[in-house]
């Protein structure tokens, strides 16, 4: 690759690192072109999967302000640049790797923080952002319902107590 081509490739990779929420580095050795196409389709529109040159990717990551360990750049490397929900893309990669053991997740980056392969797998185990937000909203709604029940119970309990006191006074007044 000529020097101007390398500079253009580094600039493009740097831009991808900067515009992505996450990037997952994988080793794809042994995968067929058809399997790579299937992987790209399974990642959907929120991620772009690209086979990259290790040296250029390392330079681009550094220019984007991302520090990655050198061991991530051993062997043939491809990067999934994620612009959408990183959980969904991590799940897609994990599921594909289960069916195709030749795909090895090496590690990655999430919001500028380096992640190990195990952390990527833990990320894949999380529920999507929408599901987590709906659970949080449900928890808030349940707490509001509980608070409303307590506030409704207080006045009715007070009324019952006052009625009981009146009845008791009426009995005592009638007994005398």
Swiss-Prot record:
Domain of life: Bacteria
Sorted UniProt keywords: Ribonucleoprotein, Ribosomal protein, RNA-binding, rRNA-binding
GO biological process: translation
SUPFAM superfamilies given in the database record: Ribosomal protein L10-like (SSF160369)
Gene3D superfamilies: 3.30.70.1730, 6.10.250.290
GO CC aspect terms: large ribosomal subunit
One MF annotation (Gene Ontology) recorded for this entry: structural constituent of ribosome
Pfam families the record matches: Ribosomal_L10
Role summary: Forms part of the ribosomal stalk, playing a central role in the interaction of the ribosome with GTP-bound translation factors.
Protein family according to the UniProt entry: Belongs to the universal ribosomal protein uL10 family.
Quaternary structure annotation from Swiss-Prot or TrEMBL: Part of the ribosomal stalk of the 50S ribosomal subunit. The N-terminus interacts with L11 and the large rRNA to form the base of the stalk. The C-terminus forms an elongated spine to which L12 dimers bind in a sequential fashion forming a multimeric L10(L12)X complex.
Protein name in UniProt: Large ribosomal subunit protein uL10
